[in-house]
Amino acid sequence: MSDKADAQFRIGEAAWVVILMSVCFGFSYLDRNVLTILTQPIKHSLSLSDTQLGVLGGFAFSVFFFLGGLPLAWLIDRTNRIRLTAACIFIWSVATVMSGLSTGFTQLLVSRAFTAAAEAALIPAGLSIFADMLPVRRIPLASSVLMIGGFVGGGAALYLGGTFLTYFSSPEAPHWFLPQLLPWQHVYLVIGLAGIVPVALLLLTTKEPARREILDVDKEVNENAPPIREVFSYLFVESGFYAPFILGVCAIFVVFYSVNAWFPAFLIRRFALSASEAGTYLGPAFIVFGIAGSLGSQLFLRRLTPDNIVPRIVLLLGGICLVQIANLAALPFATSPSIAVCVYGIAVGVTGAVLSVMLVPIQLTVPNRMRGQTMSIAYCGVNLLGTGLGPFLVGFLNERLFGGGATLGMCMAAISVSSATIATILFARSYFVFTRQRIAAKPTEIITSGAQQASISS
């Protein structure tokens, strides 16, 4: 990066922003993922069906994530991203508290909707900030650190959610505070109120970076961001690469969210574990395997050059799909919680690798004023299709075809293997399109151009 860019953000300051955004992402996953460990008590206290639980954990969340993501993407490309992120964290924290005050399906649905819409800003805003404050060679590592926060938060949701649920179910809990609430409602209140911490840290310790183009880091970006229809046209009409790539990422996240949403219930129903025991198994596995996968992808990226980073990432994602197919096909045959958790850990680990690299091609190839909207489109697509279809289809399939019994493992395997197969085909398509376009392009038109190589080596 140029001296001018280096002067704006010193190494320590940039590292703090990356770490803090990772912490914020951890809080977002804590708020959204705690539902998975509270599924059984919520199901019983509110008399919900598996389909309704699938709607809460999947379809409804993803729809409002998508609806909130597009206008927030417009704001990311035009406004102060630090303040916008802080405002969204405050909103989803309040919504989490309201989830704890819900007494029926509709109230919980509305609270989840606000949580989803507000969380849609975090990843696009964070990655957009990183692209404007870091050298290109540091962006994949920063993205990996950001995604690690999600695994820490998701694992904390499972472990702390189960622990808090046990605590608030005990006589030692402070039942004088809102005594009419059930234990699972108290868990939501505690987690929601904790959101004040990252809001304060963002507003008091960070500043907004100037916007810069990746391919010309000395050039300030002042032109207006294009409307969303032009961004869609660029991604899905003018380029043949982005459509199968983004849809492939969405398909592989159908796998992850299917497993993530229902695995605690699977352990509880299949092996008669308590919520606390399931959280004790899954929380550490989520953190350890997720971080290992995320960091492992960085070892892969360190071997790449500016000329091959995009196609090699696509190949990596295709290989991950094959691993998921083999791994999750074995889930129905797990004979103990330990074996099941190993399958879960592998699924989470390879997802960690996906999360760390999936948006790097977009960061490196899309123009600055389209970057926030493009990453938001991709991330909203992941949540609309991944979060929306995965949990819903598992719950629907289990309830309608198997009567809602202890067949969740079979349902998760069926949805996961099918989705991973589709993702493999889509990544193969995007790889061949990208390779063909590179061969046909003039040297100055290649996406990963010499200008980008110069910025990476600086």
Region locations from a protein language model:
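C-terminal membrane-cytosol helix-exit motif in multi-pass small-molecule transporters
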Residues: 166, 192-217, 425-430
